[in-house]
Amino acid sequence: MDPVKAQQLAAELEVEMMADMYNSLLRMTGACHKKCVPPHYKEAELSKGESVCLDRCVSKYLDIHERMGKKLTELSLQDEELMKKMQQGVTST
């Protein structure tokens, strides 16, 4: 692959990854806020219960996100190995 095209592709993938991370952060923030903070609140500060709820919600969300990332990486590596084996099988015939 042309080095310039490879750099462009890497830059595009980085922008896409950053957008995905931002969207994931927005989803997490919205979901945890909806779950833990009542729609009509009277105080500007979070209550202890709301704070604990948000902490747990974010912790769970990040844990699941990490687990999914590891699993997707594992599956991606398996796919790469399978593709290499298939290419070796095609080139050896």
From Swiss-Prot:
The twin CX3C motif contains 4 conserved Cys residues that form 2 disulfide bonds in the mitochondrial intermembrane space. However, during the transit of TIMM10 from cytoplasm into mitochondrion, the Cys residues probably coordinate zinc, thereby preventing folding and allowing its transfer across mitochondrial outer membrane. Keywords: Chaperone, Disulfide bond, Membrane, Metal-binding, Mitochondrion, Mitochondrion inner membrane, Protein transport, Translocation, Transport, Zinc. Gene3D superfamilies: Mitochondrial import inner membrane translocase subunit tim13 like domains. It comes from Xenopus laevis (African clawed frog). It is found in: Mitochondrion inner membrane. The keyword Repeat does not apply. Disulfide bonds join C32-C57, C36-C53. It comes from the Eukaryota. A motif (Twin CX3C motif) lies at residues 32-57. One of its GO terms (molecular function) is metal ion binding. It is a peripheral membrane protein. This is Mitochondrial import inner membrane translocase subunit Tim10-A. Belongs to the small Tim family. GO terms for biological process: protein insertion into mitochondrial inner membrane. It holds the Pfam family zf-Tim10_DDP. Mitochondrial intermembrane chaperone that participates in the import and insertion of multi-pass transmembrane proteins into the mitochondrial inner membrane. May also be required for the transfer of beta-barrel precursors from the TOM complex to the sorting and assembly machinery (SAM complex) of the outer membrane. Acts as a chaperone-like protein that protects the hydrophobic precursors from aggregation and guide them through the mitochondrial intermembrane space. The keyword Repeat does not apply.
